[in-house]
């Protein structure tokens, strides 16, 4: 049985199942750009000191080719930026598809995710798209994301999901929701908003992203206190290559 998105995330983030093996992870993630059109209060992107730019296309193609030679099976074209801001994204998906990657995916804030663009990405070979939408109300969305685009994002999500159901039933459309004390709606209310317009909703507590979220104590939910204060290893070296 295929894993749902929550199971895949839980497997990657399982701190109790980390082993040093003489094999590479099956998943790689390529940051095609570190540019972003949001300023989310829980995200380290706005604290980034690196130059804002898109990746060199030759480097992406080289990485995809070499990773496939090493038996990598899954590729995500995002890390800490908005992938739809890179005009070469469709070319990268095409290359990954040509190399027979089994699972190709992105996460987006959804602002630029118009159905015409996503249709093109699905046609090229994108297997799933995850919308990062971290509020269920317009004014609160503006507070969390630092931009007033709630209506735009919700419209894009609805249209992309309809597109998926009508033309791309094997593709998946997900929603992720990061909880802070400023958007701490009940899971029931969150799912009520999204569950009819996507395949699955993933709700997670805010993380400190390697200590880059200096105000984590001010924005975390009270019930999330232990997971924030415990010192845990980064799971990426064990489960993925970034």
Where on the chain are the PLM-derived regions?
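Radical SAM enzyme [4Fe-4S]-AdoMet core and its adjacent flexible, acidic
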Residues: 1-10, 31, 53-55, 119-242
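Conserved alpha-helical substructure of the radical SAM core
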Residues: 2-128, 139, 143, 147, ...
